[in-house]
UniProtKB/Swiss-Prot annotation:
Any Gene Ontology biological process: detoxification of cadmium ion
Coiled coil: none
Tissue note: Expressed at low levels in leaves and sepals.
S-farnesyl cysteine lipid modification positions: 146
Protein name: Heavy metal-associated isoprenylated plant protein 21
Family membership noted in the UniProt record: Belongs to the HIPP family.
Modification type Cysteine methyl ester: residues: 146
Function noted in UniProt: Heavy-metal-binding protein. Binds cadmium. May be involved in cadmium transport and play a role in cadmium detoxification.
UniProt propeptide residues: 147-149
Length: 149
């Protein structure tokens, strides 16, 4: 039977080939303003009924929902917004995760304790005026200083 099974594996259509790929297991954090138990229950039930959701944690004190499962973050956000609540992705990260947390614009009065705003890495544009002044007197370009004099 071993040879017959080996040959039939090439000819048959197996379930493994038809199996669809699932999204990877991920955690989605969403900030939602919830005032009462009814709001919390409504948001929890809407998210819990989504396909692929493993667990839902609601923290009303922080106005935060944490969803674990095989889900698309944008679909979770859209589903939470369908309840009529204003929702956005969680904009805060723990303070110890940032290399330099003392940069301006990082602290927010509404952020929970030990969290700061998620920093955005902004680099200066190539033709910024400060860039031109800094490179004017650099040691790499010796002839630039002579052109001014």
């Amino acid at each position: 039977m071993g040879a017959f099974d080996y040959i039939s594996s090439f000819c048959s259509y197996t379930y493994a080939n038809a199996k669809t790929k699932r999204k990877p297991l991920q955690t989605v954090d969403i900030k939602v303003k919830m005032d009462c138990d009814g709001c919390e229950r409504r948001v929890r039930n809407v998210v819990r009924r989504m396909k692929g959701v493993k667990s839902v944690e609601v923290n009303r004190k922080q106005s935060r929902i944490t969803v674990n499962g095989h889900v698309d973050p944008n679909k979770v956000l859209k589903r939470v917004k369908s309840t009529g609540k204003k929702a956005e992705f969680w904009p805060y990260i723990p303070q110890h995760m940032v290399y330099y947390p003392f940069a301006p614009g990082m602290y927010d009065k509404r952020a929970p304790a030990g969290h700061i705003r998620n920093p955005t890495q902004s680099f200066p544009t190539a033709n910024a005026p400060e860039e031109n002044y800094v490179s004017l007197f650099s040691d790499d370009n010796v002839h630039a200083a002579c052109s001014i004099m």
